[in-house]
Amino acid sequence: MELRLYNTLTRSRDAFRPYDPSNVRLYVCGPTVYDLAHIGNARPVIIFDVLFRLLRRTFGDQAVTYVRNITDVDDKINARAAERGITIRELTEETYHWFRADTEALGCLRPSVEPRATEHIDEMRLLIERLVASKHAYVAEGHVLFHVPSMPDYGRLSRRPLDDMIAGARVDVAPYKRDPMDFVLWKPSPEGVPGWPSPCGIPERGRPGWHIECSAMSWRHLGETFDIHGGGIDLVFPHHENEIAQTRCAFGTNMMAQVWMHNGFLTLEGEKMSKSLGNFVTIRELLKDWPGECLRLAMLSTHYRQPINWTRQGIGFAAKTLDKWYRIVGDEPAETGEGNPFEAEIADRLADDINSPSAITHLHHLADVAEHVDASSALKRRFKGAANLLGLLNETESQWRERQRQAVAVDPEAIEALIAARIAARKARDFATADHLREQLAAQGVVLMDNKDGTTTWEVAR
């Protein structure tokens, strides 16, 4: 199996060859912890979790380091803490735990390291001082700024004309800047705002700019150069472009990460998601109505580089698919590893630039094989193991049913009693009573599915 990944830097799908196969290193930009994560934030979390799983399968569990940072110093954090009347630490701790609970509900593995920006201020100062010493940055009015013209191939990642970059960066053309494109590495902290001793002999307290945070954390945990850097397409410019500039100029390297991966935008029911349009949806809100696994399957049904239109219909289809798959595997354990040919077939499809739609299509085929009346327990275990590579079917059927019921406001025992009465009526050929009971359940929003084996499963129509 050859792993091929689309590299934003080269604009091509290239064979992935890590610097060191025994030490594969992945960095992904994580959340700024000031509010609940929205469904758009879930996309990179899920996509790079699948990549993490695939890398572990390919190179070994202990050979892969996945770093996803936590930005806990930011002007939005300061403003939200003041608005709520709580400390910045209280806000960031609360929001981090919300984010962690949401990602666990989505079936994501924890990254190897989740570094916090506030724990890496020393590394940021060191990087900044290196940049000033090498004439790639300068001090001006209590700020330290990166001098963009000092890097001849700045813009190589985004490939945007200079005028577009100036507009896209929404730069503040302050009078102390040597060039309009220069960006902040360090800035003064006014009274009441978090601050630390400044680098470069600046006497006033200050705080880091956004871009230097990721350069410092990736350097600390992965080194001067590493294998893969990921994030949303909106981060290509200016954030990732500026990360590259800082890191390469600080260490004199010709590369920061050899592969840059970016997931596409998300729209909600065909519209851009925004609070002003009233269609801003958090992961937490969706988890009230759906198990996280439904959200995961719906997200993976579109290739990560393509835009995705997030719809309730899509989540509903994912729920029906998972209901069928769990019914097939029952409470069988998963068979994982090199001995599972089904898992290898899914891995081959994911190796083609994380082609999750192709992998899911093949899972539908494998489900039909495992559902066959003569299918052995081994086939079901292999099917479940194959789905596990996508982070799916991680529970038993019993756990799945219970999770479905927890997500809806119905009385499961009362529903099961009505279903049992309907089954008894059908066996007695009392179809009028059976139909009446089905209608009674439908009035509560309960949809019944009569299975080939004579059992009946149910779900709540949303």
Could you describe each region identified by the protein language model?
Residues 70-73, 95-99, 109-124, 142-151:
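Short, glycine/charge-rich beta-strand/loop segments that flank catalytic centers
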Residues 1-34, 45, 49, 58, ...:
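Alpha-helical recognition segments enriched in aromatics with Gly/Pro capping
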Residues 10, 19-107, 458:
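N-terminal, positively charged nucleic-acid-binding surface of large information/translation enzymes
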Residues 68-71, 118-125, 237-238, 315-319, ...:
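An alpha-helix initiation/capping motif
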Residues 62-65, 135-141, 370, 447-449:
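Short, well-structured beta-strand/strand-turn elements
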Residues 81-88, 112-118, 232:
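The substrate-binding groove and active-site-proximal loops of carbohydrate-active enzymes
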